Amino acid sequence: MNCLFIGTISKDLLMLVKEPPKSDRRIEAVKIQKSCGGPAATAANAFAGLGGTAGLITAIGADANGQFVRGEAERIAGKRLQLFTKEQGVTSFSTIQVEEDGKRCITHFGGCIDGVRAGELEAEL
């Protein structure tokens, strides 16, 4: 393995909007896309895309968002994945409102990654 990434994986819901909402307003999304995100998963994916071998340590909840990102985590890291499933946890997720010029507004829920303790990590990954 060339690089080990430890941290958040999340389900992202991206919505293309004409402008971000102001308080007490409802706006329409022009287009939506679901994807896998989170700092650690995004960095690991970029590293692997550049030809590196990436390992990933992250956590998900036993929920639908966790099921969504599990396959992406396995694709990114393969056998170099330590994926903690926290039965009472909630998987990290973000709603990202993107304007046509690329400006964005992110609402993020951190999920259960903070429930992982150093003693749980595998010595060899």
Positions of PLM-derived features:
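Conserved N-terminal subdomain of the carbohydrate kinase-like
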Residues: R25-R26, G49-L125
